[in-house]
């Protein structure tokens, strides 16, 4: 199906060849990390310790567990929400509605897991199933992406994403053709964006902590820090779930393999890498250094939450006393750009806070292995790339106002560095 005239966006991620390469490279990288984390040398660079056979990857029980997890999170998504938020205005001038009950889903999941563990659920066996679970999640993401692509073939032009309707099957399958694929009020992209992957990440971390307690008598201080830092991050994302409605993932990118694999497989199985590493490679950590690492994470979170809250408050009500005195630049679209407060320091202060927290998550793992720092390195590359995409879109959208903003706020993420 040819894309509607005038709706094409510039190709990203290296076009069809880049999309094909990423669809192969991302799962391979994920499995490489899972294998290396449990190996003796734990070397990030170099070949994996061994290549798993089909019997080690495929497990019908793992697939059943994966689908059950998705079903549970979908059921929690459908529960009454404390608030229903409206999304951004679409091409047809309508606005979709979204339940903001993600934090409720996290709490209910914790209660269910707690009841299960008290009833004898062997949660500590989960780390031994990470390979087949990751394979099941990858398979699910591929099949789900195919169904999304087929559904998008029947979608009206107004429902298509700006960049996912190039006419090239591989590229559109990767990036996603439809912007907001839904069945009735169930929004697949919004559901997958935070729920299954982030809550699954916390669950895997908890299972690794419990297994370490069984192996060594009690969880290490390093394991407690990693679990605590990352639980705070996930809890924050789900408490402020409404904020995701203004992100690039929701308002610009279609829902294809890139987001489906990222949400369902990449996030839970690679973001838990530090906890995986600590289970197989325990690291000594004293209270003085632990306190310093906590301070680093607190600084990162303070910047991250402060910047995001300031932006969200300003978007909702520019006259709010907390943001009314901030300096702004008017744009031709009628929106105003903040040039003071957090957003006068750098163009993406939330990214700066994110990166500081990412570093704090890796530091409990010591400094003698590169593997636990994969997330920090990967996330740096991801945010720099995302910032570049955002830069191009804002330049096109705001024109001269954006050039003035860049003159007033010259640094993108790190003050005086980048």
UniProtKB/Swiss-Prot annotation:
> TM spans, by residue?
13-35, 62-81, 102-124, 129-148, 255-277, 287-304, 355-377
Compartment(s) of residence: Microsome membrane; Endoplasmic reticulum membrane
Could you say which tissues express the protein in this record? Highly expressed in liver and brain.
GO biological process per UniProt: cholesterol biosynthetic process
Q: How does it sit in the membrane?
A: Multi-pass membrane protein
Q: Where does NADP(+) bind?
A: 311, 315, 338, 343, 350-351, 390, 394-398, 405
Q: What is its EC number?
A: 1.3.1.70
Q: Which EC class, in a word?
A: oxidoreductase
Q: Which GO terms describe its molecular function?
A: Delta14-sterol reductase activity; NADP binding
One Pfam assignment: ERG4_ERG24
Pathway entry:
Steroid biosynthesis; cholesterol biosynthesis
The record's comment on protein family reads: Belongs to the ERG4/ERG24 family.
Summarize the protein's role: Catalyzes the reduction of the C14-unsaturated bond of lanosterol, as part of the metabolic pathway leading to cholesterol biosynthesis.
**What protein is this chain from?**
Delta(14)-sterol reductase TM7SF2
Annotated source species:
Bos taurus (Bovine)
**Gene name of the record:** TM7SF2
């Amino acid at each position: 199906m040819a894309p509607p005239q005038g709706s094409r966006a510039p190709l990203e991620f290296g076009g069809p060849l880049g999309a094909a390469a990423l669809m192969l490279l991302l799962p391979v990288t994920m499995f490489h990390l899972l294998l290396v984390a449990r190996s003796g040398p734990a070397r990030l660079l170099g070949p994996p310790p061994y290549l798993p056979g089909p019997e080690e990857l495929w497990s019908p029980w793992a697939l059943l567990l994966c689908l059950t997890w998705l079903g549970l999170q979908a059921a929690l998504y459908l529960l009454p929400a404390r608030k229903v938020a409206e999304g951004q205005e679409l091409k047809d001038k309508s606005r979709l509605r979204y339940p903001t009950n993600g934090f409720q889903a996290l709490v209910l999941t914790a209660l269910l897991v707690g009841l299960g563990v008290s009833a004898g659920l062997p949660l500590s066996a989960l780390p031994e199933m990470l390979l087949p679970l990751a394979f099941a999640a990858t398979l699910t993401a591929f099949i789900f992406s195919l169904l999304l692509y087929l559904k998008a073939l029947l979608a009206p032009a107004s429902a298509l994403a700006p960049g996912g309707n190039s006419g090239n099957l591989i590229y559109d399958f990767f990036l996603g053709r439809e912007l907001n694929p839904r069945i009735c009020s169930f929004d697949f992209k919004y559901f997958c964006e935070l729920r299954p992957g982030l809550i699954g990440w916390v669950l895997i971390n908890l299972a690794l902590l419990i297994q370490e307690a069984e192996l060594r008598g009690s969880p290490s201080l390093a394991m407690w820090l990693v679990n605590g830092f990352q639980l705070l991050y996930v809890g924050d994302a789900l408490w402020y779930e409404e904020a995701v409605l203004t992100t690039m993932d929701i308002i610009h990118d279609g829902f294809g393999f890139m987001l489906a694999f990222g949400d369902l497989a990449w996030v839970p199985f690679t973001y838990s890498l530090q906890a995986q590493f600590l289970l197989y490679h325990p690291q000594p950590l004293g209270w003085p250094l632990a306190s310093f690492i906590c301070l680093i994470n607190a600084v990162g979170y303070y910047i991250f939450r402060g910047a995001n809250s300031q932006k969200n408050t300003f978007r909702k009500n520019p006259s709010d006393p907390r943001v009314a005195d901030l300096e702004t630049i008017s744009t031709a679209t009628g929106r105003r750009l903040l040039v003071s407060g957090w957003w006068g320091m750098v163009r993406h202060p939330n990214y700066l806070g994110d990166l500081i927290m990412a570093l704090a998550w890796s530091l409990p793992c010591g400094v003698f292995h590169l593997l636990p720092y994969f997330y920090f390195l990967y996330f740096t590359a991801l945010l720099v790339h995302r910032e570049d995409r955002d830069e191009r879109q804002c330049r096109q959208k705001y024109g001269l106002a954006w050039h003035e903003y860049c003159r007033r706020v010259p640094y993108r993420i790190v003050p005086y560095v980048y």
